[in-house]
Curated annotation (Swiss-Prot):
Residues 26-141 form the MTTase N-terminal domain. Catalyzes the methylthiolation of N6-(dimethylallyl)adenosine (i(6)A), leading to the formation of 2-methylthio-N6-(dimethylallyl)adenosine (ms(2)i(6)A) at position 37 in tRNAs that read codons beginning with uridine. Residues 391-453 form the TRAM domain. InterPro entries: Elp3/MiaA/NifB-like_rSAM, Methylthiotransferase, Methylthiotransferase_CS, Methylthiotransferase_N, Methylthiotransferase_N_sf, MiaB_methiolase, rSAM, rSAM_horseshoe. GO terms for molecular function: 4 iron, 4 sulfur cluster binding; metal ion binding; N6-isopentenyladenosine methylthiotransferase activity. It comes from the Bacteria. Its EC number is 2.8.4.3. This is tRNA-2-methylthio-N(6)-dimethylallyladenosine synthase. Pfam families: Radical_SAM (PF04055), TRAM (PF01938), UPF0004 (PF00919). [4Fe-4S] cluster 1 binds at C35, C71, C104. The gene is miaB.
Length: 465
């Protein structure tokens, strides 16, 4: 493996004179839709903007430049972007607002047509984020949809005051599920150099970060595209030995979730025993139409291996309900899979047809009322399992990363190593950080606890489940 010499984002500052503020810094506002990868990319470009002399502001009204980081995985975020761009165009006509668009939707013809319609000035695909300095210097409409190799080379500065952070380790996806647009928008898998990953994590550690999440469309494939790179299991061991108290990863693919990964988790205390393993459907017939490359038996065998090596593992999954051609019998197989696995958590979605995918081209969609009805049944099934699993934690002491105020009055909220949301009395955890918490009560969606050794709080009415 050749050496890699990491460098931080440090472009020379450049900014035009803002209207009405000659000589002042231009102001930018970033709006992010979608996954944690998009959140990481937004942090990266925010760092770019600051290094260029821009000021980041909290609202569209304050901004000279609004950059929208888009998602194209489902139809709902696409429509949100369409609506937002319509509003931004009015601001552009009124006061000369500069509009930028990045992310997965920008890579698609659908997004590019939106950009033309709504007067987008800067359009960057997910692989072209490092073109931003050039785009802002152009002083004219700038579009870049290339996949630049240097997009993986930059190390953004640690987010100020953050206790947790994301670190991208691989971009793109080599799987071609028939419903998914990601291989089109983000390209094939490209692993980031391990020197860069470790350098970024070391900087986060020095900045006080106590929890790092390794990100990728398929983190399990890390290193396979680059001879001499460590495997994902080896990378987990390396990161787990750096002194960061908590290490997580997202997202995995059942085909690539191999035994050596399970062993690395079991043998590395810093790796959280929270495993998100998307199944999408419990029906082999539907999995075949989805081109998921595994079948129910293989998935359940992976779950068995995980349970054997990690009996305290917390499992979550993704489910698509109402995929084209899904029958009631197919759906019943998904429900029965739930009972075999007993997921702690699940992210459940109605199938959303995406232009450009094989499923969109070749399969006829199911009636919406059928999809909604099945989703409601699945949600009830998951609610039952979540409550059952959460009750198992009552009376146990867990480590909770408290991050800030909860919506529930009198509480602060954090999450344990199993990614359960945990509420504790605000008086017991006055500042964000890691606390030992005894779980006192559970609902299907929340755990309630008290900080070990803290003075008993005055009774606080618990929210109704």
């Amino acid at each position: 493996m050749p050496p890699c010499y990491p460098f931080l984002l440090s472009w020379e500052g450049w900014a035009r004179d803002p209207p009405g503020r000659p000589g002042g810094a231009m102001r930018a506002h970033i709006i992010t839709y979608g996954c944690q990868m998009n959140e990481y990319d937004s942090h990266l470009v925010a760092s770019e903007l600051v290094s260029l002399g821009w000021e980041l502001v909290d609202s569209v009204e304050e901004a000279d430049f609004v950059l929208v980081n888009t998602c194209a995985v489902r139809g709902k975020p696409v429509e949100k972007v369409r609506s937002l761009l319509g509003q931004l165009r009015k601001e552009k006509e009124r006061r000369g607002l500069l509009i930028g668009m990045m992310g997965c939707l920008a890579q698609l013809d659908e997004g590019q047509q939106m950009a033309k319609k709504f007067g987008v000035d800067v359009l960057l695909g997910p692989g072209a984020l490092t073109s931003l300095p050039e785009a802002l210097k152009a002083n004219e409409r700038f579009w870049d949809l290339t996949f630049r190799e240097d997009v993986l080379d930059y190390i953004p500065p640690p987010p100020k005051g953050a206790l947790s952070a994301h670190v991208t380790i691989i971009r793109g996806c080599n799987h071609h599920c028939t419903y998914c647009i990601v291989p089109t928008t983000r390209g094939p898998e490209v692993s980031r150099h391990p020197d860069l990953i470790l350098k970024e994590i070391e900087l986060l550690k020095q900045a006080g970060v106590v929890e790092v999440t390794l990100l990728g469309q398929n983190v399990n494939s890390y290193g396979k595209d680059q001879p001499g790179f460590p495997s994902f299991a080896e990378l987990l061991r390396m990161v787990g030995g750096m002194g960061i108290p908590r290490v997580r990863f997202l997202t995995s693919h059942p085909v690539n979730f191999t035994d050596d990964i399970i062993e690395a988790i079991a043998e590395t205390p810093a790796i959280c025993r929270y495993i998100h393993l998307p199944v999408q459907s419990g029906s082999d017939r539907v999995l075949r139409r989805m081109a998921r490359e595994y079948r129910r038996a293989h998935y359940l065998e992976r779950i068995r291996k995980i349970r054997e090596a990690l009996p305290d593992a917390v499992l979550s999954t993704d489910i698509i309900v109402g995929f084209p051609g899904e029958t009631e019998e197919d759906f019943q197989e998904t429900l029965s899979l739930y009972d075999e696995v007993g997921y702690d958590q699940a992210y459940m979605f109605i199938y959303s047809p995406r232009p450009g995918t094989p499923a969109y081209k070749h399969f006829q969609d199911l009636p919406r009322e059928v999809k909604v009805e099945r989703l409601m049944r699945l949600i009830e099934k998951q609610k039952e399992w979540s409550y059952r699993r959460n009750l198992e934690w009552v009376g146990k002491t867990v480590e909770v990363l408290v991050r800030g105020e909860a919506k529930e009055e009198g509480f602060v909220q954090g999450h344990d190593r199993g990614n359960h949301p945990v509420l504790v009395p605000a008086s017991q955890a006055p500042v964000p950080g890691l606390y030992q918490v005894e779980i006192k009560q559970a609902t299907p969606h929340l755990l309630f606890g008290e900080v070990v050794g803290a003075e008993a709080p005055a009774p606080i009415p618990l929210p109704v489940a």
